[in-house]
Amino acid sequence: MTRIILSILRQAAEPFTTRDIALLLLVERRLDRNDQRLLRLMTKRVGVALRGQREKGAVWSEHGPGQHMLWRLAHRKIV
């Protein structure tokens, strides 16, 4: 799942909410994106994966609209 999430963020032109990423993940995995229960579950799982990647320094988060977090890749300087 983390691989797909990072791939989604690599292709993003702007930061995405956790829910946006979960929706794109459902499409990538060819799952029913209209299933609200599945979307809520995947949003939680994506959030857990993103927090783990934030702790590793791979992604950054910032407060977005309402209680939503916006996520983007952390750009590392290669020396």
Q: Where do the PLM segments sit?
A:
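Short acidic/glycine-enriched loop/turn segments that link adjacent beta-strands
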Residues: 65-69
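Positively charged, polyanion-binding regions of nucleic-acid-associated proteins
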Residues: 1-17, 45, 51-54
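Residue-level detector of family-conserved "landmark" positions at structurally sensitive sites
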Residues: 19, 35, 63-64
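Short, positively charged loop/turn segments that connect secondary-structure elements
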Residues: 26-48
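A short, conserved structural fragment
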Residues: 51-64
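Intrinsically disordered, low-complexity serine/threonine- and proline-rich regulatory segments
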Residues: 1, 76-79
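Short capping segments at the starts of secondary-structure elements
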Residues: 10-19, 24, 28-31, 71-76
